[in-house]
Amino acid sequence: MNTAMFKDNRYLDLKNIVPVDLCRIVTKYALLKEETEFSPELGNNAQVENAHSVYSDTLMETMLHFLLPHIEKNTGLSLCPTYTYYRVYRPGMVLDRHKDRPSCEISTTVCFGFNYTNVSSDYKWGMYVEPGNLITQNPGDIIIYRGCEVEHWRDSFSAGSESYQVQAFFHYIDKNGPFYPEYAYDKRPGIGYQLNKMHK
């Protein structure tokens, strides 16, 4: 059923895929990295200005393999991993409407954790997918989407100061598609290599 939905809609909203305890660990990890090894997006390559963002983090690259069978099962595709990218969103940040580059043919965004202040108890900061469907997530939920085809974006993060949301992006290409093998591992020797850090 999910494979048919993905084929028709070009995205899937899946709940409770990543274990909650693992989500807590990743969230604490990302926040600690933000505090001790701050890596902001800056300049012309910035997609979310000043957000702590990391390409090819070793923990995330490990999870790229963990998620692979889930993504293949729900899309019906045979996939090759390309790369990962995680980001800590803070109040006022916006993700502009966009499509992704070839290495993001099949993309997955995972919500690992959040903390909201000065908002209503039912507030959730979600992602829009073309044509304008808002998807909200709890920790462990994932959205699979065709990153090169489906526009996606986030409105301004309107929660209060000290709020955060930790999201990570796990990218793959179809082994039977137009971007394989050229974009395998995002043109790196393999998963985990810290190359092309400016890519998103």
Language-model features, listed with the residues they occupy:
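Catalytic core of non-heme Fe(II) oxygenases with the double-stranded beta-helix
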Residues: 91-153, 161-168, 173-188
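Conserved active-site beta-strand element of glycosyltransferases/polysaccharide synthases
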Residues: 88
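A short coil-to-beta-strand element that immediately follows conserved catalytic motifs
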Residues: 76-85
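A structural signal for short, well-ordered beta-strand segments and their strand-loop junctions
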Residues: 13-14, 80-81, 144-145, 169
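Generic beta-strand or strand-like secondary-structure segments
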Residues: 66-70, 85, 107, 111
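Acyl-donor (CoA/ACP) binding surface of acyl/acetyltransferases
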Residues: 158
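Acidic/histidine-enriched, glycine/proline-rich intrinsically disordered or flexible terminal extensions
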Residues: 182-200
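Non-heme Fe(II)/2-oxoglutarate
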Residues: 1-75
